[in-house]
Amino acid sequence: MTDQPETFRRRIFSRSSWPEWQRVSELLRTETVGGALLLVAALAALVWANSPWSAGYDQVSDFVVGPHSLHLDLSISAWAADGLLAIFFFVVGVELKREFVVGDLRDPAKAALPIAAAVGGMIVPAVIFVGVNLVAGHTENLGGWAIPVATDIAFALAVLAVIATHLPSALRIFLLTLAVVDDLLAIIVIAVFYTTQLSFGPLAGALVTIAVFGLAVQRGVRTPFLLLPLAVVAWALMHASGVHATVAGVLLGFTIPVLGRHACADRMEHRLRPLSAGFAVPVFAFFAAGVTVGGLSGFASALSHPVTYGVIAGLVLGKPIGVFLTTYVLARFTNASLDEDLAWRDVLGLALLAGIGFTVSLLIGELAFENSPIAHDDAKIAVLTGSVLAGLLAAVVLLSRNAVYRRIHEAETVDADDDGVPDIYQPRQDQ
């Protein structure tokens, strides 16, 4: 009788369904390539911005193109942040819709943990950043509180795919689910806290256009000659409203049907994810990561600024503490429990991995410090440095855990009698 309550305890990081794991496996392959391209683009931007030819980088980044009459005469870097990232957020919107309709987030009991972990992983780094800048007496920097709250799924999954050859699949699924919730919360933060001027006319027009787009796809319309112009008009109106234009991408993604006769979420995601991960996000990274460091002395000077060490502390300390502590508290004080095949060190490695912030963190940095170039550059340096440190710490922890699971796997696949069946699945001769 004493063991009975344990059967009702929900396992944290329990095994997902086979179709869900197949989908995640395909997603891992795409995001791994995207993460590699993201890294290459960021490194290329850093090298160019700190080379004798850095003026060329600035000229390309600041080159203005677009129709002035429509107030779309934007710099190349602004087109990358406002335009190309809308593709990324459209894919995020489709992924969110799918998770809430047929994925792990459709079950409130399963969704509670990643949602709570994501919230904890956003609150703690924000509190650390605010605390650091308050103590330093730089209240003018408080607008950057949201910079360290985001997790870059492409980078995180790329690191996990490289080092985690034998880690339990449930860890990867949990990271993906947490990152999806993280993206949703980051989108809400951008829409609510980084909208400076709101024009209700264009906003209403954008929402009506999105509704027409949604009605079309719900009715089975698939022709890009209709859907693409509607999406562009919705994006332009959202941009004119003062709300960040990428929010239009998310809302358009939410309208894509997941179930039913006209379901096309999987098909659209399959077609657009390579464009997002392979082009849109790397191009954004190229124009967002190019910051003139000024050598070791310049780097050391940047590290002395509260924006820099506030963001780094938020990513390297705040993110892991928030994710790990929330998960532990739920396991300790609710009916949730850690899966018997996992150790808390696995969760620690995952929590450290969540500290890799890049795409959304850089975007929030641009929005928070668009009128403060020095603070903006400090934020860029901090995001890059903090993400690298978090990735390295996660790699150390997860590599050690991967070695443990590799030894377990090797022991479980021993076939001493060469009969094609591992010995662990055969009865012992002395029984």
Curated annotation (Swiss-Prot):
Q: Where in the cell is it found?
A: Cell membrane
Catalytic reactions of this protein:
Na(+)(in) + 2 H(+)(out) = Na(+)(out) + 2 H(+)(in)
Does Transcription show up as a keyword for this record? no
Gene Ontology MF terms in the entry: sodium:proton antiporter activity
Which sequence ranges are marked TM in the entry?
33-53, 74-94, 112-132, 144-164, 173-193, 197-217, 225-245, 279-299, 311-331, 347-367, 379-399
Q: Which UniProt keywords apply?
A: Antiport, Cell membrane, Ion transport, Membrane, Sodium, Sodium transport, Transmembrane, Transmembrane helix, Transport
What biological processes does GO assign it?
Answer: regulation of pH
Query: Does the record's keyword annotation contain Ligase?
Result: no
Q: Which Gene3D superfamilies match?
A: Na+/H+ antiporter like domain (1.20.1530.10)
Listed InterPro entries: Na/H_antiporter_dom_sf, NhaA
Q: How does it sit in the membrane?
A: Multi-pass membrane protein
| Cystine pairings recorded for this chain | none
Q: What's a GO cellular component annotated to this UniProt protein?
A: plasma membrane
Q: What does this protein do?
A: Na(+)/H(+) antiporter that extrudes sodium in exchange for external protons.
User: Per the similarity annotation, which family is this?
Assistant: Belongs to the NhaA Na(+)/H(+) (TC 2.A.33) antiporter family.
Question: What name goes with this protein?
Answer: Na(+)/H(+) antiporter NhaA
Q: Which gene encodes it?
A: nhaA
